[in-house]
Amino acid sequence: PISRPRRYAWAMAARIALLLLLGFAAACAQRGVPPRTVERLELERYLGTWYEIASFPSWFQRNCVATQATYSRTDDGRVRVENACRDKTLSGAWNGIEGIAWPAEPGDFTRLKVQFFWPMRGDYWVLALDPDYRWALVGHPNREYLWVLSRTRAIEEPRYAEIVALAQAQGYDVTKLRRTLQPA
């Protein structure tokens, strides 16, 4: 017969193993489910300049500070994307790239396809958006890319924490977020 303390230890170990297994299963399930986008986006209100507050590091933004994106309509109804940043320091040279974006589904600007180089395309999903279009949370459905954008170069810390919590709730690894240096 197994002693009472030993049974208790086995029961606790089994509970802990079950909790770990359930946590792992929940994490895997979240990975298989694409993130949710905002229900609706009014493109005319979204157009204009946005400043990057934070992002996941990426090879294509290596050495970037003071990063900003400007969106405008093209004659054919698509969106012109102009990304710019300074090289390494706030006084560094400006670097930029132009691309084009269009809705993945006609009329739905919450999920865009973006192309900077033919034939490569990327996904640009608006995950959260301030009702007054003051800030936006943008990500890729594979959760490897994430951006916190604002109409101003700075955002209040409590608001930033709320946005980060929204990203985490959608399954993004927010420990990878890095703040973007912007001029004061």
Would you name each region that the model predicts?
Residues 16, 23, 28-184:
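A beta-rich soluble binding module of mature secreted/lumenal proteins
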